[in-house]
Amino acid sequence: MGLELIRVAAQRNEVAVLVYEPRRPRNVTIVAGHGYSSSKHNLDFLCAFLQSHGCRVYNFDFPGHKLGASGGTLRGFDDCIDAMTAVVASARKAGDAPLYTLGHSMGAITALFVAAADPTIAGAVAIATGYGRPSALSVLRAAGAVDFRSAYVDGVDLPALLESIDAGFDRWIPRLEGRPVLYVAADRDAMVSPASVRELYDRAPEPKHYALIESDHTYAGEHARGEVLQWLNHLHPRA
């Protein structure tokens, strides 16, 4: 199995991407995006696991994230969309395998929106994101109960980034109709409740699948590996 760091030129920023090449490819490609204030390292365990099961994975850093290697500034959600869209285009140059977008938290929203905008994307995986997040973040901020880790990001803070995200869901999620999407909630998630994930799932078109895993918010990607693999195996049985 191989691991290569590449750089992809998006319209707004250059994007650092780790490419996980499987030893025995199964004709499935995944483009993966991390959550706010994190980096591609947060999804490394999940990506390496999927690589070991034959998937080619592109795991990238969103711009403006100081723990990552992309640099630049995160000016708004359009920068997230631009980054993942550029990585999808780069991944397609390597072959025509069915391609899925995958993400955790902020990356999950991005994965859903990018897939919705591109009907040639086979489907998506959304881990630990849900409907109604702006209201939940406002409550957490007012209570002083959470640090949104804005110091780890050059650019917009999380509440500002997500302030109109529900309108985005209303616009884009219906466009996923006919393509499979996996929605994963974590039972100990203090940032995105399972009820919020379930509401997003209930609003989404078919085909879709909902899974509840044992995890907190931060490590939901790692702990979702079994559910993600099972979902992929159902769609693409190994010979």
Residue positions per predicted region:
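Short beta-strand/loop motif that positions the catalytic acidic residue
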Residues: L176-E177, Y183-A185
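Catalytic histidine-centered segment of alpha/beta-hydrolase-like enzymes
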Residues: S215-G226
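Hydrolase active-site cap/lid region
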Residues: F113-A160
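Short alpha-helix in the alpha/beta-hydrolase fold that links the catalytic acid
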Residues: S193-Y201
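The serine-hydrolase catalytic nucleophile loop
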Residues: Y36-A48
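N-terminal cap/lid segment of alpha/beta-hydrolase-fold proteins
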Residues: M1-R24
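Conserved alpha/beta-hydrolase
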Residues: C47-A69
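Catalytic nucleophile-loop/oxyanion-hole region of alpha/beta-hydrolase
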Residues: S37, H65-D96
